[in-house]
Swiss-Prot record:
It comes from the Bacteria. GO terms for biological process: ribosomal large subunit assembly; translation. GO terms for cellular component: ribonucleoprotein complex; ribosome. Coiled coil: none annotated. This is Large ribosomal subunit protein bL20. Binds directly to 23S ribosomal RNA and is necessary for the in vitro assembly process of the 50S ribosomal subunit. It is not involved in the protein synthesizing functions of that subunit. The keyword Ribonucleoprotein applies.
Amino acid sequence: MPRVKRGVQARARHKKVLKQAKGYYGARSRVYRVAFQAVTKAGQYAYRARRTKKRQFRQLWIARINAASRQNGLSYSRFINGLKKASIEIDRKILADIAVFDKAAFAVLVEKAKTAL
């Protein structure tokens, strides 16, 4: 069986990992073994964070809608229920945006939700 030399592939793999670890502190950006562990862990954190980001933004939108609807005399759950009964289909992201940047329009939505209840 002939001898297989894998120096080129190993060098390329090491360079790839070290390039991904650029900007890390100390040995994490210079030593392949440590950099590989750091890059692997960073990938796990990134995978997890892509999922938690969705939950966190939804929580933020709900908190903003709740605060704005309470200023207009209605709780969040009753406000959402009123919108559903009034057949107004605006998602929470847009509702939160309206609540922050256009308080008059949000007040109109709250009034429509109140009349539908």
